[in-house]
């Protein structure tokens, strides 16, 4: 089984000082990760060093607030499932499902990881000929504000890939209460 961390939009130190303790505990207690996907807006080199310490394989895209240089889009594959990573500022309005589907098709990916909205959301869309696209947005790891409809809740996703089955576990912090939701997809 392959385990990955999906996170982003920390905005440290401009909008948050640090990762909330409970989110840090989740990250540390679930190690090791075979890969980390970061949706951009990490802002500082300190956060970059931290993210790179979590796995030997780290994928990062440039957010609209990053001054550090990263690619705009990344594609990779796990168990023959094509995965794309973008920040999400490429679509308007923020989080627009049709725009994200268009990008997923352009990138030829079955899973599109995106951020920017600061609102965690996992949806499956059935396309032509029964094909499916999963849109996975981990929200903001620090739960900071954004220019749209941010949830203001720290959140992240841990993904498990076993053959052609993918289990995504979404963690969201509501004040001091941690909630988890699981999603299973077969490709």
Residue ranges and their predicted role:
Residues 54-58, 123-142:
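Short acidic, glycine/proline-enriched helix-loop-strand junctions
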Residues 12-15, 42-46, 65-70, 91-95, ...:
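Active-site environment of divalent metal-dependent phosphoester hydrolases
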Residues 1-5, 75-84, 126-135, 161-168:
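Beta-strand-turn-beta hairpins that frame and shape the catalytic cleft
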Residues 6-8, 35-41, 59-63, 84-87, ...:
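Active-site neighborhood of phospho(di)ester-bond hydrolases with catalytic His/Asp-centered motifs
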Residues 102, 107, 136-187:
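Binuclear metal-dependent phosphoesterase catalytic core
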Residues 57-108:
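Helix-adjacent hinge/juxtasegments
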Residues 1-57, 66-72, 152-155, 183-187:
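N-terminal active-site segment of His-dependent metallophosphoesterases
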Residues 18, 22-25, 89-107, 144-152:
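Binuclear metal-dependent hydrolase catalytic cores centered on His/Asp/Glu-rich metal-binding motifs
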């Amino acid at each position: 089984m392959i385990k990955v961390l999906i996170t982003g939009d920390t905005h440290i130190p401009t909008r948050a000082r640090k990762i909330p303790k409970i989110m840090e505990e989740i990250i540390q207690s679930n190690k090791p990760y075979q890969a980390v996907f970061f949706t951009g807006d990490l802002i500082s080199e300190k956060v970059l060093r931290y993210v790179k310490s979590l796995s030997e394989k780290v994928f990062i895209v440039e957010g609209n607030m990053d001054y550090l240089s990263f690619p705009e889009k990344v594609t990779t594959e796990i168990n023959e499932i094509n995965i794309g990573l973008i920040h999400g500022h490429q679509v308007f309005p923020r989080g627009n499902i049709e725009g994200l589907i268009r990008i997923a098709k352009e990138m030829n990916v079955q899973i599109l990881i995106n951020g920017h909205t600061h609102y965690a959301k996992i949806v499956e869309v059935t396309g032509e000929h029964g094909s499916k696209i999963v849109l996975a947005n981990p929200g903001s790891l620090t739960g900071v504000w954004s220019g749209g409809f941010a949830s203001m809740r720290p959140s992240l996703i841990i993904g498990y890939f076993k053959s052609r089955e993918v289990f995504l576990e979404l963690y969201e912090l509501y004040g001091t209460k941690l909630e988890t939701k699981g999603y299973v997809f077969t490709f």
